[in-house]
UniProtKB/Swiss-Prot annotation:
NCBIfam families: PRK13737.1 (NF010297). GO terms for cellular component: periplasmic space. It holds the Pfam family TraU. May be part of a periplasmic complex containing other proteins. Residues 1-22 form the signal peptide. The keyword Cytoplasm does not apply. The lineage of its organism: Bacteria, Pseudomonadati, Pseudomonadota, Gammaproteobacteria, Enterobacterales. This is Protein TraU. Appears to be more essential to conjugal DNA transfer than to assembly of pilus filaments. Required for F plasmid conjugative transfer. Its main location: periplasm. Keywords: Conjugation, Periplasm, Plasmid, Signal. The keyword Signal applies. It is found in: Periplasm.
Length: 330
């Protein structure tokens, strides 16, 4: 009952929150949990290796057997369940140049002031660069709507702010960032970055290549795990890049767990310090909600950015992050 009341309040509140006014550089709107969501992106839905419902976007591998036997606490020791796979809306991201601008909530937090203000600039070689802040929200939409009822197959809880880059010194300082991604130096060369062309092509026609984990497809390089973007050609593209970096960063920090679409392994969740790119999708929800489609990580924005990236915007963006979940419905 409490969850339904919370959802009703969200629905009534959505669309009635004025754009952030405390900061003239901040703009946003509350995400409507019904009308702003691409509900077809939850598909395909699978039972074992069988597709129960088809989807428009490519799917990952699933367990071959629909019936799984999983460990259980005493006195049961073993439980039998159905192996299901679906795409779960599990997080929202704000991307902004204005510190404290909560794009997906529609207001600004004045406490941050001008700390680590985002920017766009050119270096001495006249190369475009920019800096963005990212906020990560826990957004367990399937739990609110009771779409999936097994606790082992959904992200529970309420909407919550899980991460603010403004209070993370590694997000603004590239030297500190190396603490989280010391391997970045290995891939900071033309050969490694040239290999990212293969990831961009794979993302454009199917799914990204997990083996090229340092690549963000058409968006550029996953490293470093901070808000600095070099060679910026499009603010919208940069906003996607830093959102994907944040997903990688939270995986590295152990804040996001991963499921595996294999027999037996499907019973549990596991830490994954390397981002499984093929198991993630994104959908724009701010400033121009796109409830008709979602896209694999790394896919070029040229397919859908028309009308969503005008030059007179204040460079504030919001995305809904979808994650593939394989689990055992008990």
């Amino acid at each position: 009952m409490k969850r339904r009341l919370w959802l009703l309040m969200l629905f009534l509140f959505a669309g009635h929150v004025p754009a952030a006014s405390a900061d003239s550089a901040c703009e946003g709107r509350f995400v409507n949990p019904i009308t702003d969501i691409c509900w077809s992106c939850i598909f395909p839905l699978s039972l074992g290796s069988i597709k129960v419902s088809q989807g428009k976007v490519p799917d990952t591998a699933n367990p071959s057997m629909p019936i799984q036997i999983c460990p259980a606490p005493p006195p049961l020791f073993r439980r039998i369940g159905l192996a299901i796979g679906y795409w779960e809306p599990m997080a929202l991201t704000d991307v902004t140049r204005s510190p404290g601008c909560m794009v997906n909530l529609g207001f600004s937090l004045p406490a941050f002031g001008k700390t680590a203000q985002g920017t766009a600039k050119k270096d001495e070689k006249q190369v475009n660069g920019a800096f963005y802040h990212v906020h990560w929200y826990k957004y367990p939409l399937t739990y609110w709507l009771n779409i999936i009822t097994s606790l082992g197959c959904l992200e529970g809880g309420d909407m919550d702010i899980a991460y603010l880059s403004e209070i993370d010194p590694t997000w603004t300082d590239s030297s500190l960032t190396t603490i989280l991604n010391p391997e970045a130096v290995i891939f900071a060369n033309p050969i490694a970055q040239g290999a990212c062309a293969a990831d961009a092509i794979a993302s454009a026609f199917n799914m990204p290549l997990d083996v090229l984990f340092w690549c963000a497809g058409s968006q550029g390089s996953m490293y470093p795990f901070n808000g600095w973007v070099s060679n910026e050609s499009s603010p919208l593209q940069s906003s996607l890049l830093v959102s994907e970096r944040m997903a990688f960063k939270l995986h590295r920090q152990g804040m996001i767990m991963e499921t595996i679409g294999k027999n037996n392994a499907v019973c549990n969740e596991y830490p994954s310090p390397i981002l499984p790119k093929e198991r993630w999708r994104y959908q724009m929800v701010n400033m121009y909600p796109d409830s008709g489609q979602c896209h694999p990580f790394g896919r070029s924005v040229t397919r859908w950015e028309t009308g969503k990236n005008p030059p007179n915007t204040k460079k504030n963006f919001g995305y809904l992050m979808w994650r593939k979940r394989n689990c055992v419905f008990l």
